[in-house]
Each structure stands twice: as structure tokens, then as C-alpha cells.
């Protein structure tokens, strides 16, 4: 679509005022730290390569299971409420109509921004998991190309799976608190469903 990169840049500039990117990176920093700490505390002193690689796999799996499956939908729900409500809150719909920007293009732009933030959060999670594994000697890091690629594909899947929650948020068009609660409950239900499926 013509003009889409400019619209995406505008959405990022609007979110920049709310300090969203530092918050996303901070969240992606804290969770891998906790994950690697749990992995390190469970190590038994085995120095074999297979065991150390297994500990890194354990940290990576925990990061995917909790950092992405549980936390990322909450993050995307909050971002969706900010992206879709800011025109309402700032009373800038009349400015958009004056440009004009097609509603479809505006929605696609906001969804692409959600996807970009999702990938930023995911890549930061993997990076910090790798860094903390090195720092705390909590395993042997390996297979990074595959792990980064798989995490990105996983993140895209989570973003797509979160779209029903985004639709609810936009449709009800209520307060930020209600949007966050909807995102939280949707995230918990999705995570619980994944746990049940993995156990069967």
C-alpha cells in the first residue's frame, strides 16, 4: 500500500511519547533474568556438553512458554488499546479525515505496528536469555539461528492468535483498564489451553 511506511512511522512517533519501547525492553529484560536464575539454581554440577545445552534449552523453553505465550498477549492488548484509542482520546479523527486516510489502511498500519512491537519484544527476550546464560554460566548457548528464527515465527503466531482480543478491545471501545483486563484474561485462557494440549 502506498504511504504505509509513513503511516507506520507516524504511529511509532505517537507511541514514542508514551515511552512504550523502553517499557517493552524492560519487560523483556526482567523475565529472562528470572528464567535464567531458575535454570541456574537447578543445575547439579554436570559439566557435559549435552547437559549444559539442555539447560539452555530449558531456559529457552521457559522464555517461550511464559515470556511469550503468557505475557506477550497482555502486552499486545495494552498496545492495541493505545493504538486504537489515541485518536479518540486526542480528538484527532477530524484531522485524519482531512488528509484523508482510508480506514482500512489505518487499521492495517496499526496491526503492523503491533506485529513489529511483538517481534521487538521477542528478539529482546531471546537476546537477554542468551546474554544472561553467558553471564551466569547457566548452560551452553548453541543453535542461535534456529532459536531466533523459531521465536520470531512463534511470535507472529501469537500476534495472529491475539487478534480476537484486539477485536474485542476495539469493538467495546471502553477504558484502558477494561482493555488490559480483557487482554489479561485472554492471555491466561490461551496459556491454560496450551498447557492442557501439551499434557495430552
Regions found by a protein language model. Name each.
Residues 34-41, 172-200:
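Transmembrane helix segments
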Amino acid at each position: 500500500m502506498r504511504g504505509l511506511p509513513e503511516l507506520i512511522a507516524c504511529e511509532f512517533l505517537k507511541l514514542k511519547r508514551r515511552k512504550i519501547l523502553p517499557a517493552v525492553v524492560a519487560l523483556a529484560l526482567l523475565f529472562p533474568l528470572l528464567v535464567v536464575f531458575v535454570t541456574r539454581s537447578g543445575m547439579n554440577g554436570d559439566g557435559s556438553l549435552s547437559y549444559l545445552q539442555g539447560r539452555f534449552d530449558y531456559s529457552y523453553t521457559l522464555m517461550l512458554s511464559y515470556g511469550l505465550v503468557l505475557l506477550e498477549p497482555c502486552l499486545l492488548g495494552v498496545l492495541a488499546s493505545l493504538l486504537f484509542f489515541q485518536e479518540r482520546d486526542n480528538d484527532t479523527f477530524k484531522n485524519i479525515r482531512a488528509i484523508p486516510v482510508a480506514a482500512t489502511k489505518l487499521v492495517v498500519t496499526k496491526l503492523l505496528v503491533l506485529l513489529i512491537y511483538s517481534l521487538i519484544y521477542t528478539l529482546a527476550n531471546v537476546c537477554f536469555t542468551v546474554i544472561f546464560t553467558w553471564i551466569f554460566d547457566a548452560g551452553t548457548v548453541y543453535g542461535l539461528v534456529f532459536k531466533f528464527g523459531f521465536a520470531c515465527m512463534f511470535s507472529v503466531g501469537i500476534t495472529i492468535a491475539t487478534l480476537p482480543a484486539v477485536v474485542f478491545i476495539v469493538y467495546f471501545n471502553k477504558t484502558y483498564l477494561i482493555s488490559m483486563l480483557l487482554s489479561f484474561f485472554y492471555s491466561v485462557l490461551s496459556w491454560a489451553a496450551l498447557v492442557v494440549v501439551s499434557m495430552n
